[in-house]
Amino acid sequence: MPFLIQYFSLLLLSGIFIAAGGCGVHDPDYYNRRGVSMDSQGRIDDAIGEYKKALRLEPYNRESHYNLAVAYHKKGLYKEAIEEYKTVLELYPDDPETLYNLGAIYARSNMQDAAIFAWEKAVELKPDFTEAHYVLGFTYAQKKQFDEAIKEYNKVLEKKPDDAITHNNLGVAYTEKGLLDAAIDELRKSVKINPSMAMTRKNLEFAYRKKGMEEEADNEFKIYEELTKKGNQAQ
């Protein structure tokens, strides 16, 4: 069984908003800016308090809702984060970053179909959204929808042709479909870009064996063992 590599753990796109405006205590942007400053210092709880103050003054302030959602997301308060992201989308439906982050929470909660729905809408709004294409590919592969995974990984490689992990995962998808020549080609590209990823060596060994190329498979397995001893799983 070949191995997928997930190279960002459902990346949280912060994209914190700092609104321009007045500086008085009755100005929601004042509290929003204070929250952003506290957030940048790692004072997430204090930042949440400031964003809530901004929203008490202006309940439909999109920037404060988004920043509050991100703060909740960082703290792992996913239910609260979902509510805030949904509020942002009510105010601004065509926000691909919010859709991406919402999908990330759904994926963490094993709600893969909901995650895919959010990410598909994100890439519809922003076709060159590489991170969203990658997680779509990864999630489709997990669901064994390899044609869809291949499509998404190729879109990533259009923007990031030297991404070793995406080449690896595309190779895995081709292997699962029995397209061994294409799989070997992608895995070799991955190895050329980053020779030290042990899992890619293991995947290449697997593809070679399925192809009947035992000598090449044995060589990759030896390299795989050497790399795992050094701790190079997905570097």
What are these regions (language model features)?
Residues 22-26:
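Bacterial signal peptide processing site
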Residues 40-53, 75-87, 94-97, 108-121, ...:
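Structural signature of tandem alpha-helical TPR/SEL1-like repeats
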Residues 27-63, 67-77:
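Alpha-helical segment of the N-proximal tetratricopeptide repeat
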Residues 57, 91, 125, 159, ...:
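Structural marker of alpha-solenoid helical repeat scaffolds
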